[in-house]
Structure formats: structure tokens, C-alpha cells
Amino acid sequence: DFEDLVDFDVYSLCGDGCMMEGISSEAASLAGHLRLSKLCWIYDSNRITIEGHTSLAFSEDVAARFEAYGWNVMHVADANDQAALSQAFEVFRRTSDRPTLIIVSSHIGWGSPHKQDTNSAHGEPLGDEEVRLTKENYSWPTEPSFLVPDGVYDCFADRIGKRGAELCAAWSAT
């Protein structure tokens, strides 16, 4: 019984290459057997590996594999659908009898005019020109080359930074 041992949620972000590795099968099988309900794997399914499209070496039904392991399996059809992602996380937090796999369909290099959905977006820098074109695609300023908009920075500092500092202080006090 792991109820008392682990009283917090554990999240892991996994990609196509991770699902191709044997260790993911072994770990997932054990997690299902032990009914580790605090465990949530988010599978970024963009169908691309560093070598190329997953169809080169991977054709299994990941959802069926994890269902066979006893996992709760959910699908989010669009990685940019924040409402669907939030709903999937809520279902995970209410699941008390097994681990959860959330399969999220995405596009690697999303918004890059020449590299979206290619393995070059996985294992290579976009390059200055492709970065400029991608920023134009997003209607972002092209200069400076690295930019975090003030609103994003402020939101992160307020929601993540402040909360993280509070949680760290509470953890350190125990």
C-alpha cells in the first residue's frame, strides 16, 4: 500500500522516443500493477523522433498498451487546447485506483514554416532565418532574437515563482 508513502502527485513528460524504449514498458507495467494513482505521464505524441517519423520503427497502439497495464488513458487531440488539458488533469486528480496516461497530440516545431512536423525540429537548431520566420508567423517582434514578453514574464513570476517560493518555504519548515 503506497497511499501513505506518497501523498503528492508525480508528473512525467514523455515523448515518442520514450515510449519506444523498453524501460518505459517495464516501469509502466509495474506502476499499473502497484496501482500508483498519484502518477501521471503526459505523452507528447508528435510522431517524430530524432531519426524521422515514428512510422520508421514504431507502430504500436500506446493507448492499448497502457490500458492493458491497468492505466487510466485519456486523449487530448490538440496540445494547444488548454481547456481539454485542464480537464484531463482534473480527471487524473480524481482517479484514485490507477496511474494515468494523458496522450497529447502535438506538432513538433509548431509554427515553424519549414520545420514543423520534421525531425530537424527535434535534433537541430531552427537557425536564425527560421526563428525570424516563425516569429513572423506568430506576429511576434523579430528583434531581439530572444524575447520573453513582459506579460509572460510577469505571469510566470506571479503564478509560478511566487507559488514556488511559498511551497519551498513550507517544505523547508517541515
What do these predicted regions represent?
Residues 5-8, 13-14, 18-22, 40-42, ...:
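Conserved acidic/glycine
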Residues 15-35:
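Glycine- and Gly-Pro-enriched alpha-helical subdomains that act as flexible
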